[in-house]
Amino acid sequence: MYNGSTRLLDQFIAHISVERGLARATVRAYESDLRRYLSWLAHTRGITDPDAIGKADIEEYVAQLDSDGDSARSKARRLASIHEFHRFALAQHAVSDDVSATVKAPKSAQMLPDVLTI
């Protein structure tokens, strides 16, 4: 199924790899994160149009990542990919609003440093 979201994703991937010159591994990470996100939207929510995505959809996706056992760092990285994608969609006039702008990344667990004892 080649829809508005996947077309926009292809444009986004071209943009970050060619125009922004991001490293190949970074581009692959963005693409993997966003394909998973867009697939979830299509299969769970029936959303294939980027302008139909709402803040609640993104928040539900992040909650799903939590249920899947993703670490806080993984969720934060995936959400950063989603933020970049939605900013790009707004810049391309593919959406009327960046619904991801107010979705916050989960807090990472704070680890106390090991204490050196003698």
Language-model regions: role of each:
Residues M1-R7:
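Short, low-complexity, intrinsically disordered N-terminal peptides in bacterial proteins
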